[in-house]
Amino acid sequence: MSTISYTAVGRRKEATAKVKLQPGTGIITVNKKPGETYFNYNSEYLSTLRGPLLALGLENDYDLHITAKGGGIKGQTDAVKLGLARAICTMSSEKRESLKPHGYLTRDYRAKERKKYGLRKARKAPQFSKR
């Protein structure tokens, strides 16, 4: 018996998350671990992750199977949020209209700026000496 599933990819900074959304009871697994364990029981990360589902009232209707790579925990959380919103949009276009005003479908393109030669960091210059 095959169940219906919706997949999408989200990215943030160096993090990438593949999100698989299946009808179920609201179980979240990240890299084959429970979501609470993976995100260290941090309620801020878990509420950010569930944001698109909470906006539509679907938090207990779907199971999430997530593969997250790269970056840190915060970047992965935001990548999952974007991937989840995109997966929900593949279900139906009217759900897209309700997610868009909340900003769940917007990719946060900010990333670390590269270091330039002659500088200590991306923009920090060595101390200036007049004489």
Swiss-Prot record:
GO BP term (any one)? translation
Q: Where in the cell is it found?
A: Plastid, Chloroplast
Q: Which domain of life is it from?
A: Eukaryota
Q: What are the record keywords, sorted?
A: Chloroplast, Plastid, Ribonucleoprotein, Ribosomal protein
Keyword Metal-binding (UniProt): no
Molecular function, one GO term: RNA binding
InterPro entries membership: Ribosomal_Su5_D2-typ_SF, Ribosomal_uS9, Ribosomal_uS9_bac/plastid, Ribosomal_uS9_CS, Ribsml_uS5_D2-typ_fold_subgr
**Record-level GO cellular component terms:** chloroplast; cytosolic small ribosomal subunit
The chain's disulfide connectivity reads: none
Pfam families from the xrefs? Ribosomal_S9
Q: Which family does it belong to?
A: Belongs to the universal ribosomal protein uS9 family.
Q: What is this protein called?
A: Small ribosomal subunit protein uS9c
Gene source species:
Emiliania huxleyi
GN (gene name): rps9
